[in-house]
Every structure is written in C-alpha cells, then in structure tokens.
Amino acid sequence: KPADLTEEDYSKFYRELYPYGEEPLFHIHLNVDYPFNLTGILYFPKVKNNIELQRNKIQLYCNQVFVTDSVEGIVPEFLTLLHGVIDSPDIPLNVSRSYLQSDGNVKKISSHITKKVADRLQEIFKAERQDFENKWDSLKIFINYGMLTDEKFYERAVKFNLFKNTDGKYFTAEEYKTLVESNQTDKDGNLIYLYTNDAEQQFSYIEAAKAKGYDVLVMDGQLDVHLASMLEQKNEKSRYVRVDSDTIDNIILKDNAATVELTANEQNALSSIFKAELPEDKDNNFWVSFAALDAESMPVMITQQEFMRRMKEMAATQGGMMSFYGQMPNSYNLVVNTNHALIKRLMNNAQQSVGEKVAPIDSEIAELRNIVDSINAANKDKKDDEIAETDKELIKNNNDKIAQLEKDKEALYKDFAKGEDMVRQLVDLALLANNMLKGEALSNFVKRSTQFI
C-alpha cells in the first residue's frame, strides 16, 4: 500500500528495475480494486528529445507472471514513455497482442492509467508549482506527446501544460493568454503568439518584438511545431508565429501600420539590385520585399514564411503526405527597410549611376503599356474570338518588347550592384544574422568589412 512505503522505497525499487537509469522525476502508485484489480508503480523518467529510445520500459504482469514489456496499443501511446510495473489479474495471459488491444478490461485499465497520470500531474502542479516548473524541461515532451495523441489527456493537461517565455517565466495557457491578449491581438482579431526556437540565433528578432512591448515564447522542443498547429485548430482566431517569419509589424498587423512610400519603379530597381547579390542554389529560394520600418531598425533582414517552414519541419518527423513539403526548397524573404539611411543612400547611388540610362527605358515601357491598355479597353466587352487578330498580335509584340526592356533595365541594375560593395555587404549582414553566411562567402565578408573599417 502507498501508505506503507517511503520515498526511499520507491527509489530503491526503481534502481532494481533500471540499475543504470537516472533517478526519475517522480512516481505514481496505482492501487485499484474496482471496477477491476490493478496495482503498479509508474515512474516519470527524465525524458530526452528522442521519443523512440524511451519506449518499452513498462513491464506488464498478471498475478506476478510477466506478460510483456512491449505495451504499445495496450496503454495509450504516450504512456509508453513512462517506466515501471503494472500488475493486474484482469489482464489475460498467453494471448496475442491484437487480443490484448481489443480486450475490454485492458481498455478500461488504459483509460484509468491515463486519468491517474493526469490527476497526479495536476496534483503536483497545484501543490508544488515551483518544483513542477523546475522539472518542466524533462516533463514537457511527455506531456506534449500525450496532448497530441490522446484527446482525454489533452482535456486534463491543458490546465497544467506550461509555456516558457524568453525571460524564463512559466505560464499556463490561460495565464499567458491574459498576459498578451490586449497587446498581441492584430487588427483582424487574431491573437498572435510569438515564439522562438533558438533564442540566441533569433536574438535580433526577439529584441524587435520586445521593443514593441510584445512577449516571446520559447518553443524549441521536438513536438512544439505539432502542438502549435493543434492549438491553432482548437482555439479559434489564435496563431503561433515564429519571430523571424516576417517583420514584427507584419506579424501583428495593426490599423496604424506604416506604408512603403517608394514608387513601383523604385521598388523594382531595389529588387533587381539586391537579387543580383542574393545566393543562388537549388535548395534555397530568395525574393525581395519592402517594409517601412523604424529608421533605427536593420536596413535589411531575412525572414522565412511561417506556413512553409512549419510544413517542412513537420515533414521531417511525420513523412507520408507531408514529405511533399520536405522536398521543396527553403523559401526566404529579404526585407528591405525603406526608411533606413543606407537604403536611401543606395537608391541615390543607383539613380546617379544608371538613372540616365534607365529613364528612356522606363519611358518606352510606359508608352508600350499605354498602347496595350488602350487596345484592351477597346476590346473589354468582346469575346476572345471577336477580337481582331491584328490587335492580338500588337498586344503580343508590345508585351514581348516590354519583357525585353525589363530585362535590359534589370541588367543595368545588376551591373551597378556588382560594382557597389554596399549591396554585397548588406546582403551578407542579413545572411550572417540568420547564420546563413559560411565558407568562402563568410571569409570574403570579413575581408570586405576590414576594408570598410
């Protein structure tokens, strides 16, 4: 009986079962006589971030006769991460695994163990919250796994599942919602939960979020991405977004968001200039976008869109249909801060260098587009087979000319970029901030930086 045992007794028994194992976090003593008979002791091990290596540690007995230590399908999947012994005369001997899995008593036992585990965790959380928080890093993967795979456990665990922020503070879901709801709800009513999976690597993004008064969670566990997706499904108008997925103003859009004041031609020019120096390889795709950030913010930064990155991360552990995403190249966005002094200087340099050559090209493109627009306007109420072939041919020829002129203009900006060290330096700074600058490119950056100094 539990009342007859001391903590030392439980520890001694664990060492007998697992002589080379680390001391467990704590234990649960099962002692049930209705509606079935069951005794047992389950231990919470210090779970590592490798689920597969932690299974098959529960020994199943019937009247002290060993039945199996492979309990998947007999107890809920997440409970296979526990260690310990279960003994019940209601578990039939000498039967197949499939029979055990479908046996009514076994199902009741499984459900009861799930409830006892959840109740024990809730009890520890309420009575010894500080101790619970201290052990959270070891408990986390176990609890998250249970929430993802067992709906009844999820319903209980949501009360004691914890979130840790970058300041090292712990919160329940309800506590954290109360903390951030007023400040991190966007203009469409979505509550945005910001998170990082690497606080050191994403430091600058975290600081940008904190500068806005936002809070950032640490979600660096093996199952955190999967849990975030499930929580989004269960909680309407809530989104989990990594801090480096976009500029902070775009992640949490407000009604007073600043707008980019560059013209379309100016944006195209800067886009061509930066594309000329961005890495080109089959595993990574880059595109350029613009944001009107604070003048003190970084001139350029690299972000990775939340949805595609999350799908690739989930594909790495799930496989199956998700493997489609795993085979796709990484997609990155170089965000240009149009309010930064360096970007304004770069735009002026480009104008002085190639502006006279670009101006007549822009004029010719504008004329050709006016012609195309006029023809389309004249034919807007006609079906395709009613439009004169001469009009179709003229539209095609003019569009071909426009495409070639755009290429000519892009080539001018590309040549400018190759001769402007500032462009390469800005791109490399953004890559370096994302730990994406390596090898020869990193060496060249260091040499160039020395010359700038």
PLM regions and their residue ranges:
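Conserved GHKL (Bergerat-fold) ATPase module
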Residues: 1-453
